[in-house]
């Protein structure tokens, strides 16, 4: 069974990806599960640059260890708010200065949008996935979800900006959805669906 290494140890993200790719005959592993301890600096100017850098560094590491027959997948995702000219964008995870502090990031976003009218609170989540094979083949897949930023947190599921991201068609935030509902329409879910189509060609 081909190894499919996820360039992440984020438990929420790993669970989401494993659920969506469960129909493939792949041994899907997080970095911890694969015994890989590499910290790749995300200093790219775009989501794709960050994703490719992560995936390719891990690919090179695995090749140096004599590994073969594997795929490494990395994704970079973020929130783009129209009123803020696309911010926080590639800085979404560290918007408030400290990497991965969801509550502080949400607080900062609410502060930035204080007194901003509903029709100016449009936003989208974007996810860009890059998968590289041991032979250096590269697949890029992008997905987006569109919604509005609420004035207060709502819901207990998900992570990141999910409690503020309201999807009008569902009348729910990402944090109020079941994992199946969210996976069907989330930016990562949509990017992974595109990735699945591309993987079929590689896994024949």
Curated annotation (Swiss-Prot):
EC numbers, comma separated: 3.6.1.66
Statement: the UniProt record of this protein carries the keyword Transport: no
Catalytic residues in the record: 76 (proton acceptor)
Positions that bind Mg(2+): 41, 76
GO molecular function: dITP diphosphatase activity; ITP diphosphatase activity; metal ion binding; nucleotide binding; ribonucleoside triphosphate phosphatase activity; XTP diphosphatase activity
Keyword Transit peptide: no
Bound cofactor: record note: Binds 1 Mg(2+) ion per subunit.
Coiled coil start-end: none
Keyword annotations of the record: Hydrolase, Magnesium, Metal-binding, Nucleotide metabolism, Nucleotide-binding
Enzyme class name: hydrolase
Reactions catalysed: XTP + H2O = XMP + diphosphate + H(+); dITP + H2O = dIMP + diphosphate + H(+); ITP + H2O = IMP + diphosphate + H(+)
Cofactor(s) essential for the protein: Mg(2+)
Gene Ontology cellular-component annotations: cytosol
BP terms from Gene Ontology: nucleotide metabolic process; purine nucleoside triphosphate catabolic process
A Pfam family reported for this protein in Swiss-Prot or TrEMBL: Ham1p_like
Protein residues bound to substrate: 8-13, 77, 159-162, 182, 187-188
Family, per entry: Belongs to the HAM1 NTPase family.
Subunit structure: Homodimer.
Function, as annotated: Pyrophosphatase that catalyzes the hydrolysis of nucleoside triphosphates to their monophosphate derivatives, with a high preference for the non-canonical purine nucleotides XTP (xanthosine triphosphate), dITP (deoxyinosine triphosphate) and ITP. Seems to function as a house-cleaning enzyme that removes non-canonical purine nucleotides from the nucleotide pool, thus preventing their incorporation into DNA/RNA and avoiding chromosomal lesions.
UniProt-listed HAMAP family: Non_canon_purine_NTPase
Protein name, UniProt field: dITP/XTP pyrophosphatase
